[in-house]
Structures are given as C-alpha cells and as structure tokens.
Amino acid sequence: MSDETHHSPDGKMSIRKLSYLAVGSVGVVYGDIGTSPLYAFREALKPVAADGLTRGEVISLVSLMFWALTIIVTMKYVLFLLRADNDGEGGTLSLLALLMKTANGHTAVLMLLGLLGAALFLGDAMITPALSVLSAVEGLKLVTPTLSDYIVPISVAILALLFAIQSHGTGAVARFFGPITAIWFIVMGLAGIMHIADDYGILAALNPWYAVNFLMNEGFLGVVVLGAVFLTVTGAEALYADLGHFGRRPIQWAWFVLVFPSLTLNYLGQGALVLREPLAMSDPFFLMYPHWALLPVVILATMATIIASQAVITGAFSLTRQAIHLGFLPRMEILITSETNTGQIFLPSVNAILFFGVIFLVLSFKTSDALATAYGISVTGAMVVTSIMAFEFVRVRWNWTLPMAIAVLTPLLLLEFVFLGANLLKIHDGGYVPVLIATAFTVIMWTWRRGSAILMEKTRHTDIPLSSFVSSIERKSDHSPAHVPGTAIFLTSDPESAPAALLHNLKHNHVLHDKNVILTIRTTNKPRVPQEDRYSVEKVSDRFSRVELRFGFMESQNVSQALATLRKTGLKFDIMSTSFYLGRRKLVPDAKSGMPHWQDRLYIALANAATDPSDYFRLPANRVVELGSHVII
C-alpha cells in the first residue's frame, strides 16, 4: 500500500477501493489474530480436562472465546479505538506523540506508559513468529508421525528465510498477503460450518451466561483458563497500530464481513468436534479436516503464519522508526526497500535482534504448547497501556467528562486487568520471557530519552547564544576570520546557540563561508508534515541564516532532498559548493550526571552505536566535515 493510498478520506472511498483495502488489511492487520485458532482452543481445554471434560465446560470455553472477541476486539478496537487516531495514524507511540503536546503535569507518567507499550509490542514481535510458525508446522505430525523430529529444524529454516529476505523488501509479494490470508479465513470458516453439524448444541456458546457461569463457579481454575482464552484475541493491537496503512472503514469492513464470522464459526466447529469426539482435544484445529486435506491445510497454515510474522516484523520496523524520530532511541540505519513507497523500510539492527530472539525462543521452547505459556503477557500488557492512554485521549481530545470516560473505559480496563492477572500466573512457565524483553527495551528507551535531556541541558550552559556570536564575528577587526566562497550548513539541535562544529571550524581553520546556515531538524507530533510547512527560514545577518526542517514521525528524514526545495525562498543551495559540518561528541561519564553509573554507561554505549548522522539524514558523503569534541555527561 502506498502512503498516498493510506490517507484517502474514508467517507469518499469507492466500493472498489474499499474492497481492495479491506482485502489488503486482512493480510496485514488480521494475520496474527487469524493464526490463533491453531492453538487457542487446544490450550484452553488443557487445564479444564485435567479431571475430565464435561459438555458444559466445552460450551463455556467457546462462549468465553466468542465474548472475548466481541468485547475486546469488536467493541474496544474495531468500534472505539479506530476512531482515536493521530491524523489517521494509530499505535502506542502515535497516541503518545499526540498526548505529550497536551499533557498537564503528568508527562513523565504518560511517557513511561508509552515506552512500556512500545516495548511490549517489540517483545510480541519476537514471540509471534516463533509461536505461529511452530504451531503450523506441527500439523505435519498428523500428516505423518515420522516428521515429528523435524518440526523444529523446519520451523527454524522457514524463519531464517523469512528474516533473510527482509533486506530485499516484500513489496513484490505483499500484494498476495491479503488474498492468501482471506482464503485462510474462508477455509477456517467452512471447516467450522461442517463441524457445527456434529453437535448443534455448541450454538449455546453464543449465550454469555455460559461464560459468566463458568467463571463464577470455577474459581481459580476459571482465572487459569482466562490466560489461555486470551490467546483468542492476540493480534488485536495490530488493528490500531496499522490504522494508518488502510484507514478505519476498510479495517472495520474486513472484520465484520470476513474475519469475525470466520473465527466464530471455526471456534464453534472446534467445540462441536470435541463434544462429539473428546479425544480430538489433542489438536482440535487440524483434526477438523479429513486426512487427504491435512497437507494442503498445513501448507496454507504455514503461509498464513509467515504472513502474520511478516506483518509483526514490519510493525516492529515502523515502531522503531517512530521511536527514533520521537527521540526515544538513537539513530539507526533505515533502508527504504521500495522506489515508490517510502513506508516500506528495513532496519538491519532490528532485523538481527528479532531474528536471534525468535530463533532462541524456538530452540528453547521447541513446541507451540510450551511457547503458548509465554505468550499473552506482552499482549495483555500492551492492551492495558493502550486503554489507559485512551482514557487520557478521550478526556483531552474528545472533551469527554470524567464520569463518561470512567463509565465507558473502566469496564474494559477491569476486564483487561483480569486477563493480565491470569497471564501473570504463567510467569514461572515461560511468562518471564516477554517480561524480560519488555523491561530491557523500556530501560533502553528511557535511558536514551533521559540521557539526551541531561546532555542537552549540560551543553546549553556552556553554549554561546547565536545572536551574540554573529554580532561579535561580524565586527571588523584584525582578528576577523578569512572568508571563503560557498555555503556551510551546520547541523544543531539548538538553533538559539552557536553550533559546536561552527566554533571548532573557526578555532582550527580560521575561516568563515560566504553563507552560513544553522540547520535544525525537528520531528513533529504529527505523522506527516505538509510540504508548505516543511521549513522555515530566518535571516540572522547577511552571512547567517537559521533554517528549521520539519518532518512527521512516520517520514524518512532526507535532508538533502528537503533542502533542495529551499530555492523557492531565495536561499541558493548548490550541492557542489555546499559543505555540511557535523559535531561528533565523545561522551565521558560523570559521577554527578543525574543518572546511575550503569545508566551513564548504557547511554554512552547507545550513543556510540548510533548511525552516523550523515548517513541517517542522507547527506552527500563527499560534502560532509566532522569536527569532534569531548563532552562530560
């Protein structure tokens, strides 16, 4: 999908375009939730079946799954959250960027919540590919038991290939993701319809009383079961995160016309199968199909899980770029893999981290049964964070009264906290994995944000105001620097101060260019910046100008390209007579930095690992001059 496609007003969308986007959203938005039937019902049956399985328990479990889909996915995400957008974009960091502008006194709390939500999503991006691919490949055991020993090697090979092709981009095959996943949903729905006839009594699961009665009577077992039932709605966060790719209406249409009916029918079919044949609880999904259809279904399931994994990986790339632009992570290499769509990106460092994390999980847990216990915490945590931030959103942006916000969102929050509590019971069985991953990412992002703020404050105390510097340097004297032809552009984060690179250039080279541009790059709290708002130019003196370039947090920051548009303002920009001056700082830890020593060390390590700004901002390598300095943090 191109960026242009994403932002058509929903109200003016033709039926043809709506259908096209709806099918596309099935592969990207619903890929993850579409793989849940592979393991969700099976995992929910296990704790209940320990002392024998009754008819009422099977119906109650399916009822819990149906109403989880109805309340959390349909009501919260499809009908409510898809309207809480930031200029068409959704997701935790997009919501955070919007709220930070209007936060009143609790910025730090909001920021920490947003970072936690982003970190939980990155943890989910490791677990989802491992679990979904394993669960699909395990279907081979039913085709022929001799393949049991090859499940892990085959899964590792598929995942290795998936991560290997990321650098080449997936645009060429992405057009097939939606149709393939749509076929997957249709096949699941048809299988469900066929097996509902096994026992029409399963239709009683649509009555919420079965779900409520089960939780009221089963006590602690009911809480344990909720942890498995929650697997039904994993992937719901993708609805919100991918809002900007397809728009609200196509995502809603896809849910109500195809995805929700197919999931409901499949879970009802699995339930009816187990009612008729209790031994089918060992793998109710694959046992719905006749033996001759098993291999094609396993192949289709594997394709569906690969597509779901691809969607999560792409989401991780997009989220990381947002985090970099919003100042939560250091610069990383961002490669655009499409000549026509700047939204198709590849981050080598993120790809490597995800790859090693996913392979480690597959080799450590070995089965989808074991890995399913680790799943859920990251997703429930992210959902709770989103709901809390949505509470702030409706108060600030929609002007809801406090009682109204409490009345609408408190029931959802309470339900999600119950699910979170149920998943936390699995900490010792592998649930610690997403907790550790999320903690690590949160600490990294918080450290970078805090360290950057401290560094900015320290350098500001020693900086020379730009106006004072220009006044003194342009006074005629015997010590005036020599003037050289051309333009010098000095990148700085503080446009009010003379850049360190400018001062070092004068100190060591004793020259000043005919034209000097103090350039600041700003990331706004909007996903994209209109071309007319891209830049502002302020003339400081005959030789000095102050320029600010603005980018949205979803945009690639191609500075050379943006500067070319400045010719309209009369600021001549000839790449062959322009030099870019960058300051490179060597950071030295200080006992009085305001952060613990280990955090100082972490911040310095992150700064040293950051991508060179000349590469990140797409500056011509042969026109860049770097001047270094030591800074104590």
Curated annotation (Swiss-Prot):
Keywords: Cell inner membrane, Cell membrane, Ion transport, Membrane, Potassium, Potassium transport, Symport, Transmembrane, Transmembrane helix, Transport
Transmembrane regions: 21-41, 61-81, 107-127, 145-165, 176-196, 219-239, 255-275, 293-313, 345-365, 371-391, 402-422, 427-447
Subcellular location: Cell inner membrane
Molecular function, one GO term: symporter activity
Protein's membrane topology: Multi-pass membrane protein
Main localization, broad class: membrane
Reactions catalysed according to its record: K(+)(in) + H(+)(in) = K(+)(out) + H(+)(out)
InterPro entries per UniProt: K+_transporter, K_trans_C, K_trans_N, Kup
GO cellular component: plasma membrane
Pfam families tied to this protein: K_trans, K_trans_C
HAMAP family assigned: Kup
Function: Transport of potassium into the cell. Likely operates as a K(+):H(+) symporter.
Family: Belongs to the HAK/KUP transporter (TC 2.A.72) family.
Name of this protein: Probable potassium transport system protein Kup
